[in-house]
C-alpha cells in the first residue's frame, strides 16, 4: 500500500519566492515546486503532516491527498537537462550519446531541480578526475554520488543522517547500475578512509560544522566542493582557501583546498 501525503497549493507573491526557497532549504524541505499562471504564482508543497508549520502564513488555495510516486512523476515525468551534457530521467527513455541519471520518484532530497544541486554537479563535473575516490556528504537521493561514479570515480561513499534519504539513494544507485557505498551517518561520524574529493550540498551552518573535521578525510591535494550557501551566509566561508566561487540566484557554491 502506497504511503499517503498531503499536497497543498499556496498563493504567494513573486517577491516572496526567494524567501520561501531559503526558508525551505534551511528546514530541509525539498518536496515542493512553483508554477505561474495569469492569476499569479503558486507553490505546490507535499508533506507527510496533515497540518503544515503554523508560522507558514501564505494563503492555502487547495489541498488533497496524494502519493509520493504520483506527485513527483507529475513534476519530472520527462527527461530534462540537469547540467550541460547530463540528463535526469525518472524512467527509461532513449537519450542517445548523453550521460543519463535515472531517478526514482520519492520524497528524499535531490530531484535535480534545485539550484544548489546543479551548482554542486557542475563543479563536480569540472574537478572530478578518472579514478578519484569521492565522499558525498549529505547525499540525499544519491544524485551527486551517481554522477561521480558515471564520471569515472573509483570509489564513492555516500552518507546521510536521514534514513529515508539513504533508502532512496540505495534504490537510485541500483537503478543506475553503479557501485556506491551508502551509509547512515551524522555528518562524518560514520565515515572512514580518505578521499580525493568531498562534495557536500547541505545548509551553510551544517557545512561550517562539517568543515572542522573534513581535513582528516582528505588525501594530499584533495579538494572540497561546498554548495547550499545562501548569500546571507557566505561570510562564514570567506576565510577559507577558495579555489573557485560560483553563484546563481541567491545561492553559492565553493571549491576549497585546505
Swiss-Prot record:
Q: Does the keyword Transferase apply?
A: yes
Gene3D superfamilies assigned to the protein according to its UniProt record, in alphabetical order: Vaccinia Virus protein VP39
Task: Please give the biological process terms from Gene Ontology that the record holds.
Answer: methylation
EC number(s) from the headed UniProt entry? 2.1.1.-
Subcellular location(s) of the protein: Cytoplasm
* Catalytic activity of the protein: L-lysyl-[protein] + 3 S-adenosyl-L-methionine = N(6),N(6),N(6)-trimethyl-L-lysyl-[protein] + 3 S-adenosyl-L-homocysteine + 3 H(+)
- Top-rank taxon of the source lineage equals Bacteria
Instruction: Spell out the Pfam families in the cross-references.
Output: PrmA
Q: Which UniProt keywords apply?
A: Cytoplasm, Methyltransferase, S-adenosyl-L-methionine, Transferase
Positions of S-adenosyl-L-methionine binding: 117, 138, 160, 201
CDD domains on file:
AdoMet_MTases
Q: Which GO terms describe its cellular component?
A: cytoplasm
Q: Give GO MF terms, alphabetically.
A: protein-lysine N-methyltransferase activity
SUPFAM superfamilies in the record, alphabetically? S-adenosyl-L-methionine-dependent methyltransferases
Specify whether Cytoplasm is a keyword of the entry.
yes
Query: What does the UniProt record say this protein does?
Result: Methylates ribosomal protein L11.
The record's HAMAP family line, in alphabetical order, gives:
Methyltr_PrmA
Q: Which family does it belong to?
A: Belongs to the methyltransferase superfamily. PrmA family.
This protein is called Ribosomal protein L11 methyltransferase
- Higher taxonomy: Bacteria, Thermotogati, Thermotogota, Thermotogae, Thermotogales
Amino acid at each position: 500500500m502506497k504511503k499517503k501525503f498531503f499536497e497543498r497549493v499556496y498563493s504567494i507573491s513573486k517577491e516572496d519566492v526567494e524567501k520561501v526557497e531559503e526558508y525551505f532549504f534551511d528546514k530541509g524541505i525539498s518536496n515542493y515546486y512553483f508554477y505561474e499562471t495569469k492569476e499569479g504564482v503558486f507553490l505546490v508543497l507535499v508533506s507527510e503532516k496533515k497540518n503544515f508549520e503554523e508560522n507558514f502564513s501564505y494563503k492555502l488555495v487547495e489541498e488533497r491527498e496524494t502519493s509520493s510516486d504520483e506527485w513527483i512523476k507529475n513534476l519530472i515525468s520527462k527527461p530534462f537537462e540537469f547540467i550541460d551534457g547530463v540528463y535526469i530521467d525518472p524512467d527509461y527513455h532513449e537519450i542517445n550519446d548523453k550521460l543519463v541519471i535515472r531517478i526514482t520518484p520519492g520524497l528524499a532530497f535531490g530531484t535535480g531541480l534545485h539550484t544548489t544541486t546543479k551548482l554542486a554537479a557542475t563543479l563536480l563535473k569540472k574537478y572530478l578526475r578518472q579514478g578519484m575516490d569521492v565522499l558525498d556528504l549529505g547525499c540525499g537521493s544519491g544524485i551527486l554520488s551517481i554522477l561521480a561514479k558515471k564520471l569515472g570515480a573509483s570509489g564513492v561513499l555516500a552518507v546521510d543522517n536521514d534514513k529515508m534519504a539513504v533508502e532512496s539513494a540505495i534504490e537510485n544507485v541500483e537503478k543506475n547500475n553503479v557501485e556506491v557505498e551508502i551509509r547512515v551517518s551524522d555528518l562524518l561520524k560514520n565515515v572512514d578512509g580518505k578521499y580525493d574529493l568531498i562534495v557536500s550540498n547541505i545548509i551553510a551552518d551544517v557545512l561550517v560544522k562539517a568543515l572542522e573535521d573534513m581535513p582528516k578525510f582528505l588525501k594530499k591535494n584533495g579538494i572540497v566542493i561546498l554548495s547550499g550557501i545562501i548569500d546571507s551566509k557566505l561570510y562564514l566561508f570567506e576565510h577559507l582557501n577558495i579555489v573557485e566561487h560560483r553563484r546563481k540566484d541567491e545561492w553559492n557554491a565553493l571549491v576549497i583546498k585546505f
